[in-house]
Structure formats: structure tokens, C-alpha cells
């Protein structure tokens, strides 16, 4: 069983069932429970060229409102697959629950899930995305994506920050933390407290030159705390 909470609008969202024998059922629940109409279509992918964009005129759309159950009893094998599409005139939230069972056992319309089933979802832009066994994207072609793992693969809401975090190993994070500590302690904190070395310390810690001309300038702060300079004037 595979459940997906998603948002639909005028751009069709598609889900594909492959390498599985029917029947399977699809429960569509409008969230929250409203009766606003939406349209769905189920078609054999043999009738659609997946290497090019499908058009509405080639698909038989059915209008529905509220919650509904859609039952398909056809055979789905290695050479045949089904495509479930759903869209709405206005943007709304829906829950899609796809369930199926291998035909080697007795099935009902309320079939249970099968471990061998594979589902897929396309992006609203119909960009093709392919995933390997670790759900890593390794292919970028034209339209539909295929998932090699169970359940629905939908990478639309994946945060870009989480993608960055996943690419960093523990050692890399330690190195980043060490660099941040070095910059704070040696480059910022040390300069803030000053030092006797005029090349790294504060400008007010430069040695006072004991010449008459120095009286025409503002005395540095170090003068106030240096006994030698206090007595020199």
C-alpha cells in the first residue's frame, strides 16, 4: 500500500503502476473533506507515448467530487502498465491511496499491498527523473520517472538544504567546525584584546615614541596603564 498526500491543480499529476498483476484500487480522499470537483483518468501506457508529452485530447477524463474509490481489474505485467492521472480546476489537497495484490492469490476490490509493486509520480513540469536503489537521482530525460523501490517517489518537496546536508560526511562537518573555531579565536578574539606586537595588536597598543612631537597628538590608551610612560611626561 502506498499513500501520498499531495496538492493538485490544473497540471495533471501522474502515478504509474508497473510489473504487477491486477487488480488494484485507488482511493482518492479530498483533504479537508470537501466536495470540490476534480478529474481523473486511468489509461494503459501502451496507448501513450511516454517519450513525448501527453495531451488531454488523447485521455478520457472523468469528473468526480469528494472521496471516491477507483478499481482496475486489468493485468499489469512486464509489457503493460497503467497510468493514473488526476487534476483539479482549483488547487486543493488530496490523499491518494494505491493498493494492489499479486494475482496468484484471491483478490478483492479492497486488495492489500504487494511487496513487488512499484509506483511512480511525475513532477507537474513533466520532467523525467530516474532513481537508483538508494533513491539517488542518476538520470535526467524528458518526461516520466521510474522508481526502483516500493512506494511513491516524490522529490518535489525535498528541501534544498537537506540535499546539501546529506552530501556532507561527519569528517567534513568536523573540519568546518574546526575552521570556524580557528577564525573566531585567532583572527577575531585575539585582535579584540590586543597584544604587544604592533603587527597584530590594536592601534592603541603601539609603543609611545618619547619625542616632543608626541605631545601634539592624542596619547594612546596604553599610556594610561603604563607606569614608564606615565612618569615620562
Swiss-Prot record:
Glycans are attached at residues 58, 77, 93, 102, 110, 120, 155. It is a single-pass membrane protein. It is found in: Membrane. Residues 102-132 are annotated as: Disordered. Keywords: Glycoprotein, Membrane, Transmembrane, Transmembrane helix. The keyword Glycoprotein applies. GO terms for cellular component: membrane. The chain crosses the membrane at residues 168-188. It comes from the Viruses. Residues 102-124 have a biased composition (Low complexity). Belongs to the ascovirus HvAv ORF58 family. This is Uncharacterized protein ORF149. It comes from Trichoplusia ni ascovirus 2c (TnAV-2c). The lineage of its organism: Viruses, Varidnaviria, Bamfordvirae, Nucleocytoviricota, Megaviricetes.
Amino acid at each position: 500500500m502506498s499513500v501520498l498526500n499531495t496538492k493538485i491543480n490544473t497540471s495533471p499529476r501522474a502515478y504509474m503502476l508497473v510489473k504487477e498483476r491486477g487488480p488494484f484500487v485507488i482511493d482518492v480522499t479530498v483533504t479537508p473533506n470537501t466536495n470540490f470537483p476534480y478529474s481523473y483518468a486511468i489509461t494503459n501506457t501502451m496507448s501513450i507515448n511516454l517519450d513525448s508529452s501527453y495531451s488531454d485530447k488523447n485521455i478520457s477524463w472523468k469528473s468526480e467530487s469528494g472521496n471516491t474509490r477507483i478499481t482496475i481489474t486489468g493485468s499489469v505485467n512486464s509489457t503493460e502498465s497503467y497510468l493514473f492521472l488526476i487534476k483539479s480546476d482549483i488547487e486543493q489537497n488530496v490523499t491518494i491511496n494505491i493498493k494492489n495484490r499479486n494475482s496468484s492469490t484471491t483478490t478483492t476490490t479492497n486488495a492489500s499491498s504487494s511487496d513487488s509493486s512499484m509506483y511512480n509520480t511525475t513532477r507537474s513540469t513533466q520532467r523525467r527523473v530516474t532513481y537508483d536503489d538508494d533513491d539517488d537521482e542518476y538520470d535526467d530525460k524528458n518526461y516520466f520517472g521510474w522508481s526502483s523501490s516500493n512506494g511513491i517517489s516524490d522529490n518535489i518537496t525535498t528541501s534544498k538544504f537537506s540535499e546539501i546536508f546529506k552530501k556532507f560526511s561527519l569528517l567534513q562537518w568536523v573540519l568546518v567546525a574546526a575552521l570556524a573555531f580557528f577564525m573566531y579565536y585567532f583572527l577575531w578574539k585575539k585582535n579584540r584584546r590586543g597584544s604587544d606586537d604592533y603587527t597584530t595588536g590594536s592601534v592603541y597598543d603601539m609603543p609611545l615614541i618619547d619625542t616632543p612631537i608626541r605631545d601634539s597628538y592624542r596619547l594612546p590608551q596604553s599610556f594610561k596603564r603604563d607606569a614608564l610612560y606615565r612618569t615620562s611626561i
